[in-house]
Swiss-Prot record:
<dbReference type="GO" id="GO:0019509">
    <property type="term" value="P:L-methionine salvage from methylthioadenosine"/>
</dbReference>
<keyword id="KW-0378">Hydrolase</keyword>
<keyword id="KW-0486">Methionine biosynthesis</keyword>
<keyword id="KW-0028">Amino-acid biosynthesis</keyword>
<dbReference type="InterPro" id="IPR023214">
    <property type="entry name" value="HAD_sf"/>
</dbReference>
<dbReference type="InterPro" id="IPR036412">
    <property type="entry name" value="HAD-like_sf"/>
</dbReference>
<keyword id="KW-0460">Magnesium</keyword>
<dbReference type="GO" id="GO:0000287">
    <property type="term" value="F:magnesium ion binding"/>
</dbReference>
<feature type="compositionally biased region" description="Polar residues">
    <location>
        <begin position="208"/>
        <end position="218"/>
    </location>
</feature>
<comment type="pathway">
    <text>Amino-acid biosynthesis; L-methionine biosynthesis via salvage pathway; L-methionine from S-methyl-5-thio-alpha-D-ribose 1-phosphate: step 3/6.</text>
</comment>
<keyword id="KW-0479">Metal-binding</keyword>
<protein>
    <recommendedName>
        <fullName>Enolase-phosphatase E1</fullName>
        <ecNumber>3.1.3.77</ecNumber>
    </recommendedName>
</protein>
<comment type="similarity">
    <text>Belongs to the HAD-like hydrolase superfamily. MasA/MtnC family.</text>
</comment>
<dbReference type="GO" id="GO:0043874">
    <property type="term" value="F:acireductone synthase activity"/>
</dbReference>
<comment type="subunit">
    <text>Monomer.</text>
</comment>
<feature type="compositionally biased region" description="Basic and acidic residues">
    <location>
        <begin position="220"/>
        <end position="229"/>
    </location>
</feature>
<dbReference type="Pfam" id="PF00702">
    <property type="entry name" value="Hydrolase"/>
</dbReference>
Length: 229
């Protein structure tokens, strides 16, 4: 039987438009001010040094780093330093009530149902763990983090790498064949399946005609107890 479900966020639990039309512009508008006001103290100075390490430029100036961050945002680069910085900026927005984390209406009832079945539920997203926690603790449905057993970001590996899913399995202590991954992205599901996981693809729009994964349009259609392991 399935013992753990790991779900993506963007396009899976959450409308992609919330991320691209609300979160990303909010962080972009405030990024330079956030960096310049805190460049001499933690956590900003540590994040800037992390970024210098990412781009292999230990002497990069703050101006150069800000330019790099804007470039990474334009490219939707999965930079750990950028994701952490965005998370700090989004925290202000969540706490101030500027927005709440969007969840599709079918998500929380399914999380409650699976939790009642003693299935552990984890989040795996390219967004930083702190940013993930903010979304689920300040969601449209309130704080639902009590339903979640843990969070993973790219520190366990990229989402299209097979090794990332093996790492998550080891960290949770759940064998790969008892892990179920939910995502809207075929290539991520391909990597999870190659690692030995079960997979279900969330299709919130048009079907993916190239996918070989089971496709559903709602969490209501996912019944882990019926998935053979």
């Amino acid at each position: 039987m399935i013992r753990a479900i790991v779900t993506d966020i963007e396009g899976t639990t959450t409308d992609i438009r919330f991320v691209h039309n609300v979160l990303f512009p909010y962080a972009r508008e405030r990024l330079e001010r956030f960096i310049r006001s805190g460049e001499q103290r933690e956590p900003v100075n540590l994040l800037l040094n992390e970024l210098r390490g990412e781009i292999h430029a230990p002497a990069a100036s703050v101006d150069q780093l800000i330019e790099t961050l804007f470039k990474f945002m334009d490219e939707d680069r999965k930079s750990p330093a950028l994701k952490s910085i965005q998370g700090y900026i989004w925290r202000e927005g969540y706490v101030n009530g500027d927005f709440t984390g969007h969840l599709y209406p079918d998500v929380v009832p399914a999380l409650r149902r699976w939790s009642a079945q003693d299935i552990d539920i984890y989040i795996y997203s390219s967004g930083s763990v702190p940013a993930q926690k903010l979304l689920f603790s300040h969601s449209d449905e309130g704080d639902v983090t009590e339903l979640l057993s843990g969070f993973f970001d790219t520190h366990v590996g990229a989402k299209r790498q097979v090794s990332s899913y093996r790492n998550i399995s080891m960290k949770t202590g759940v064998p790969v064949h008892q892990m179920l991954f939910l995502s809207d992205i075929r290539e991520e599901l391909d990597a999870a399946r190659e690692a030995g996981w079960k997979t279900v693809q969330l299709i919130r729009g048009e079907p993916d005609t190239q996918s070989t994964h089971r496709q559903v349009s709602s969490f209501d259609d996912i019944h882990p107890e019926q998935i053979p392991t």
